Amino acid sequence: MLNRYAANVDNYTEGERYALLKKIDRRANKGGNITVQAYGVENIPNENGFMFYPNHQGLYDVLAILDACPTPFSVVAKKEVGNVPFLRQVFTCMKAYIMDREDIRQSMQVILNVTKEVKEGRNYLIFAEGTRSKNGNHPLEFKGGSFKVATKARCPIVPVALIDTYKAFDTGSIEPLTVQVHFLKPMYYDEYKDMKTTEIAAEVKRRVEETIKEYGGWD
């Protein structure tokens, strides 16, 4: 069914596609002995047109947030991830943008397109680290350039703290696993309008790290 939706993506509404993805995702999580604990769902803005900025631990991150989030969203992913089986179909169903970071013109066009769509009321997720951390729950530097979409769209920024998602695909274990997805309080435009993108990045990272420490993910 996922392949059919992916092959005929324009025949279905975003709500229909998202409902299917959640159903498949939760079935896969159950089969894989993975429990997703969602925190702060009430912090997700009621009005569409916002950006998620999570820390990046691995290939499972988007699937964890998909399980936890009741509101449809899409993704800006790097080219390498867009070629991963199953994730490729998931991203197609999400109408995600695949960014080739070596192609500056293409990357700029993606930023412009996503900014336009966020202004029109779509929600997007960007990994501000640019690549996944190889140090578990310890995030890398959040890059200021990742926040250009938010500043151009003047949209709410929702920091997301992921804990232990790296264990899902990257450790090879079949033991039961619990991962945490924390939706933190949004930063609205009035709060960050006078900040540089590097300052926004540092503040979002600070909030994410604080949450990881508070909930026992800091080892």
Language-model segments: residues:
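Short gly/ser/thr-rich secondary-structure transition/capping motifs
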Residues: G31-Y39, S107-M108, I163-T165
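Membrane-interfacial terminal anchoring regions of lipid-handling membrane enzymes
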Residues: M1-A19, V36, E42-N46, T198-D219
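Generic preference for hydrophobic
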Residues: A38, F52, V75, V181-F183
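Non-catalytic C-terminal accessory region of glycerolipid acyltransferases
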Residues: M108-D219
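Short acidic-hydrophobic, aromatic-tinged amphipathic segments that line or gate anion-handling sites
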Residues: A38, Y97-D100, Y189
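Hydrophobic/aromatic ligand-binding patch that stacks against planar heteroaromatic rings
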Residues: A28, A64-I65, V90, K116, ...
